Amino acid sequence: MKKLTIFMAILLMVISIPSFAQDKTEKPKEAIKPALLVIDIQNAFLPRMSPDKEIAMEYINALIDLFRKNGYPVIRIYHTSEEYGVKPGTEGFEYPETVKILPTDPKVMKTYADGFNKTDLDRVIKATGSNTLFLCGLSAVGCVLATWIGAQNSDYKAFMVKNAIISHNAEYTKNVEQMFDAVTYDMVQLIIENSGK
């Protein structure tokens, strides 16, 4: 019986060696190619946001500066809605003049919370060559969250940026930042400045 046990142990080891060897094979890591998604910081929606929106706007502008300085795309996303009267060409549709976007930044318009749903956002991102997305804007509990999920479903690495997302309730925003592991500005800066462009 002892010989049979030893034989079975040796046989099990021999059989499992190829599977262990296969598990050790490393896939080459894809280089980080970041893009910033600035979501829905439109004049019609900002008055409904919590008072921490002023701090968030500072972070959003700092992120725009960081991405632009390092040659990475800033993609602006706009929500259009008949219900809320947010139509292209109206003041409510536009971003505040204090936001450092440029007319040359790619622009995507959406009618659903998820920026990927029935839009050309995926095509726009692919055209920039980006594979890693950093999200800022509003609402943390609405369009930012839905677009983060859409990015995950579209096989992008996606991160919300802490203090650069806002909602109508600051506590809800903090909960989203915690639940979805929002990254800090300093972490984004570290990634951007070391991503090899």
Where are these regions (language model features)?
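…and closely analogous acidic/polar surface helices at protein-protein or active-site interfaces
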Residues: 49-67
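Short acidic, Gly/Ser-rich segments with clustered Asp/Glu that frequently serve as metal-coordination loops
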Residues: 42-48
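Positively charged n-region of N-terminal signal peptides that target proteins for export
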Residues: 1-4
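Bacterial N-terminal signal peptides
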Residues: 8-16
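Active-site loop/turn elements of alpha/beta-hydrolase fold enzymes
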Residues: 41, 79-80, 163
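Short, solvent-exposed loop/turn segments at secondary-structure boundaries
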Residues: 48-52, 86-89
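Von Willebrand factor
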Residues: 66-83
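Active-site-adjacent betaalpha module
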Residues: 21-28, 32-35, 62-65, 87-197
